[in-house]
Regions:
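Post-transcriptional modification and biogenesis factors for structured RNAs
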Residues: 1-187
């Protein structure tokens, strides 16, 4: 199955879509995105990162967000500023620990895939992202906690051939969500 494509341009070439066309396209994408997607944030402390992740989660149709550890709360002004109101589109639950959050995700029928540069991790493009998944991301400086890595079903990393060792957590979340959705659309 391939994702819906935007309507074609005219003789003048491509053009930006009108709002009604964007809404129609979004409805089609939701229809073909059968797999459930959720996120678990383990001590993501910077409010602007949390807000960016929430906005991306809403854009990719994530249905749930588990916040744990020292993750900035959705009520923080910095989160609200970056999320631009999208926090109302994603259900959120605060859990005491990443292990409790991972167990809640598993109980909801989600495979927990931690996104981390760790020994034994598989490249994201080889990770089992088919079906219902919860992508777990960790702290900006320390990544996912050892406790979270121990309970995750899979640990995956984003291959980065450049000279930088890691991505910003909000960027990594968006890359992982895009790959999960791409996988759902191409099976």
């Amino acid at each position: 199955m391939t994702p819906p494509v935007p309507p074609g341009g005219d003789a003048a070439g491509p053009r930006q879509l009108r709002p009604v066309e964007v809404k129609r396209l979004n409805r089609e994408w939701r229809r073909v995105s059968g797999a459930r997607l959720a996120l678990l944030l383990d001590s993501v402390g910077q409010p602007f990162n949390v807000g960016s992740i929430v906005r991306s989660a809403a854009a990719f149709g994530a249905e749930h967000l588990w916040l744990c550890g020292g993750t900035a709360p959705l009520s923080h002004p910095g989160v609200a500023k970056t999320a631009l109101g999208t926090q109302r589109l994603v259900q959120a639950t605060v859990e005491a620990s990443p292990v409790a959050a991972a167990k809640a995700a598993a109980a909801a029928g989600l495979r927990v895939v931690a996104i981390e540069l760790a020994s034994g991790a598989v490249p994201l493009h080889e990770a089992p992202l088919d079906g219902d998944v919860c992508l777990a991301l960790g702290n900006e400086d320390h990544g996912c906690s050892a406790a979270l890595l121990a309970v995750a079903d899979v640990v995956a990393y984003i291959p980065q051939p450049g000279r930088v060792g890691s991505l910003n957590v909000a960027v990594a979340a968006a890359v992982a969500m895009a790959e999960a959705r791409r996988r759902a659309w191409t099976r």
